[in-house]
Amino acid sequence: SSAASDVYKRQTALLCGMALAASGLMLQTTFNNPLADPSILGISSGASLGVALVMLAGAGTITAGVFTLSGFLSVIIGAFIGSMLVMGIILFFSTLIKNSIMLLIIGIMIGYITSSAISLLNFFSTAEGVHSYMIWGMGNFGGVSLQQLPFFSLVTMAGLLITILLIKPLNALLLGTRYAENLGINIRRTRNLLLVATGLLTATTTAFCGPISFIGLAVPHIARLMLGTSNHNSLLPVTMLTGGAIALLCNFICILPGEAGIIPLNAVTPVIGAPIIIYVIVNQRKIQYFN
């Protein structure tokens, strides 16, 4: 029934928002960069390439939202491998390049490379493959069926749990890597755990709901502006809750047309996210986030 599917959608939106916001916060802290997030660093596009390979090359007949279990698992695995690969590349470059702006540019370049690969896959794919990929790419919280919801919830909760366990190392990273090492934090292990958690959360949300932009980028800033602190003890839970709330708001806007159809999610998130980012950039001198 539509009432039941609305409940699943809300639950998916809540978890998705929490996952993307937590990923954005972790990346901003890890790279000490207020403009880091899964979509800008190319992690979402890595996941999208994984999905495209499965949807368009593997079996052009997989349609968005009605994956069989094996097809749907392969989509998740594809997304996870894609996002982890990009995270690995970014981490590799982060050891070579200390300038965080340059790192963002590398992420954007990776995004361009993956989107050109996706364009090629679209060119050689079947019409229904392209159509299902296009629909998926618009973003939709309705992509998780009742059968898939327990799996989706479990994986997302596991990723969020890892982030909560990383609060202490994240706080240490804020003060700089040298200081964190003096506190006895294993930087490499922390970064690897952050890599896995962010990869897991980004891959799961991207595989199910499409590449959703701006939630991961904007929400940590909203939370910081509300709290006036960068301490992850309070910042991480508030970021998660705000992410969930904003995703629910976006979901509400998406379903406003009712019978006329659903507004694509990626038509709504930038409208909310972009003004916040512009505000943060304009007032960056006043807002002291990072050390």
Where do the model's predicted regions map?
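Alpha-helical transmembrane segments in inner-membrane proteins
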Residues: 5-291
